[in-house]
């Protein structure tokens, strides 16, 4: 009998969202969004679930529902930086697996969270694990808001990009620049899923790593790890996860799912 990989789930949550203010505290069926996310992390089997925020109201909401919460600085440029502060404060062992569960994804699949943690444990040469799924629609391949990842033979990330990678010269070149005429990909193209598992030793070193030119160009923070020589293992799933909440329309859609009688 195999035992699940032990891991810690950290949920970075900040109130200062420009498109949806006070997002972590938005009501979903009588509970704040951040609590719904924490419940998913607990269902995934995390040994410890921590809500990390710079807002006392978010910490209070988590604690009121029985979850641990830790106050972090307000000036973090990314969720990874917030995780790094938490990892340093708790002094976890180097090989501790820490999963960053986004605070605006109350519908995230607990199985995916658990599987990404296990995927990192199964790849000792990697500092990070994440996930991706196949893209079947040409429009997604050419959409810069859809982040693509190119993989090596061991499904370790070679590069993440908003551009269409890999570029199929024979399939795409005859139609360029008419994106609407592009055929569906006849080879594997993968969309990155923004769920990460980290080794604690990497999180402690992350704040000291200089930003990478490719990170700044693409506006993708995972490129900093690749730039500095770290390896990222990628778990391939068959389908896309439920979308997170970024806008009032997203919130209304998810709130409807938490109404009594909804399925």
Curated annotation (Swiss-Prot):
Cell compartments where the protein resides: Cytoplasm
Annotated pathway: Nucleotide-sugar biosynthesis; CMP-3-deoxy-D-manno-octulosonate biosynthesis; CMP-3-deoxy-D-manno-octulosonate from 3-deoxy-D-manno-octulosonate and CTP: step 1/1; Bacterial outer membrane biogenesis; lipopolysaccharide biosynthesis
Molecular functions (GO terms): 3-deoxy-manno-octulosonate cytidylyltransferase activity
One GO term describing the cellular component: cytosol
Domain of life: Bacteria
GO terms (BP aspect): CMP-keto-3-deoxy-D-manno-octulosonic acid biosynthetic process; lipopolysaccharide biosynthetic process
Keyword Ribonucleoprotein: no
Catalytic activity: 3-deoxy-alpha-D-manno-oct-2-ulosonate + CTP = CMP-3-deoxy-beta-D-manno-octulosonate + diphosphate
Pfam families, A to Z: CTP_transf_3 (PF02348)
Enzyme class: transferase
Protein EC: 2.7.7.38
SUPFAM superfamilies per the UniProt record, alphabetical: Nucleotide-diphospho-sugar transferases
Keywords, in A-Z order: Cytoplasm, Lipopolysaccharide biosynthesis, Nucleotidyltransferase, Transferase
UniProt similarity note: Belongs to the KdsB family.
Function recorded in the entry: Activates KDO (a required 8-carbon sugar) for incorporation into bacterial lipopolysaccharide in Gram-negative bacteria.
Protein name: 3-deoxy-manno-octulosonate cytidylyltransferase
Designated gene of the protein: kdsB
